[in-house]
């Protein structure tokens, strides 16, 4: 069976976009292997850290990703997105070069092995969340950093995007994310893409149920993505 990786653009446990992804999973799970990318522990990208990760991987392959690292919160950068989810900028990423080197290796391998990627993302300030930008900054780096023209794990990889948010239906976010994905040479399915405007009840109880029309849109995107994967 072909393998699709789901990427959730929010770290919130009960994220609306995680709920949306679970509906999409139910539409595809009988025909595809579905896995979720865990990149919560991925640090902010910088080339010094990249070099230390590469060096540590060359010297040892026994490092492990620490899930228990404490989270430090920044009161100065906290704000909520249009869909009510806390922006990634309000939560410090764990800065553990060797442990995160292991995370990066696992993340890259999962992306390399999959047949396609489906992103589910909220919209933050008319754009995509910083944690997604950081993820794709890492993934767009050459696998061999000594050769800048070397292939990346995402180059040519098929991908599509959906999002649940406010009245804008994540349209601005998806447009800008599509642009980024094309720039890093991914094969982007831009039509159709599902954008969900969350109803009043979702903001009240933290859950939402797709309308028949929204479910139909998601089904159409799922089927077109199946065709797109070939």
Predicted regions and their residues:
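N-terminal beta1-alpha1 ligand-phosphate binding loop
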Residues: 2-29
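A generic structural motif
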Residues: 29-35, 186-187
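N-terminal beta-loop-helix "entrance" segment that forms/cooperates
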Residues: 39-53, 93-97, 202-205
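Glycine-rich phosphate/pyrophosphate-binding loop and the adjoining helix
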Residues: 46, 187-230
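Short, basic, low-complexity termini and linkers enriched in Ser/Thr/Gly/Pro
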Residues: 51-100
């Amino acid at each position: 069976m072909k393998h699709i990786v789901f990427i959730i653009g929010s770290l919130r446990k009960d994220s609306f976009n995680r709920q949306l992804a679970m509906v999409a999973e139910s539409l595809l799970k009988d025909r595809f292997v579905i896995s979720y990318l865990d990149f919560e522990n991925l640090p902010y990208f910088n080339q010094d850290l990249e070099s230390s990760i590469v060096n540590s991987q060359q010297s040892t392959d026994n490092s492990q990703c620490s899930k228990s690292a404490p989270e430090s919160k920044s009161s100065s950068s906290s704000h909520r997105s249009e869909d009510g989810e806390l922006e990634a900028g309000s939560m410090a990423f764990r800065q553990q070069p060797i442990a995160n080197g292991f995370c990066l290796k696992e993340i890259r391998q999962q992306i390399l092995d999959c047949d396609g990627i489906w992103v589910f993302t909220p919209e933050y300030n008319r754009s995509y969340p910083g944690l997604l930008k950081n993820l794709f900054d890492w993934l767009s780096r050459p696998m061999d950093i000594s050769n800048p023209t070397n292939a990346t794990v995402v180059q040519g990889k098929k991908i599509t995007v959906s999002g649940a948010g406010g009245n804008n239906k994540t349209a601005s976010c998806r447009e800008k994310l599509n642009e980024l994905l094309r720039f890093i040479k991914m094969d982007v399915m831009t039509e159709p893409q599902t954008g969900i405007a969350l109803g009043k009840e979702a903001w009240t109880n933290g859950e939402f149920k797709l309308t028949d029309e929204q479910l139909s849109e998601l089904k159409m995107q799922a089927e077109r993505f199946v065709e797109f994967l070939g």
